[in-house]
Amino acid sequence: VPPSQRLLRAAEELFGERSYWRTTVADICARAGIATGSFYAHFDSKAEIFGAVVRQINEDLRKAIRAALETAGSGQRARERASFRAFFTLLSQRPWIDRIVREAEFVAPAVFREYYEHLTRGYARGVRQAQLDREVDARYDPEVIAYMYTGIGNFIGMRWADWTAGGQVPDDVVDDVLEVLRRGLPPLGPPARHVSS
């Protein structure tokens, strides 16, 4: 594994465990098994490697979603399920990544914004295609829907994967998310299957 990748992996783990502010370059180098002086051959600062970690998380997530979509089958609902499941699976494997991205809002605001712009751009393209295929109501702005998907995914993932230190988001939770996306929140309807307290 190249030294830069070892540093990125170590930095991701430490930023997730301790936060940006409580992690030092020396900590990252010790975890990576690399001399502290060698760090600066790859990154100029702790801030730079933090931005690189957030970008790597974004790339890993988009790659996981693309792979899931290749086997998702046809139809918007199948693609939505595959996308959510890919995110939740990555989050269960690396539950700290959501904390790192949230911290980026304050540590590296431009990187934080870039993260969500890249992520939602892909979702919006998928929604627009679903609108053209008449699977999603074309009256709604694809960007709005993309940010809704992202917000839902973030908070569901935080609750079931991050807060449980790597737990899986249950299938019935994913089913509920997809049903709400499909039907909205109508004022009347059949009784809910369950109510969480």
Roles of regions detected by a PLM:
Residues 1-11, 28, 49, 53-65, ...:
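Generic hydrophobic, amphipathic alpha-helix propensity
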Residues 6, 14-48, 52:
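Helix-turn-helix
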Residues 20, 136-137:
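Conserved hydrophobic residue
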Residues 52, 63-94, 142-149, 171-174:
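Hydrophobic alpha-helical connector segments
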Residues 59-62, 90, 108-135, 143-147, ...:
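Amphipathic alpha-helical packing segments from all-alpha helical-bundle domains
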Residues 86-110, 155-162:
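Amphipathic alpha-helical segments used for helix-helix packing
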Residues 185-197:
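C-terminal effector-binding regulatory domain of bacterial HTH transcription factors
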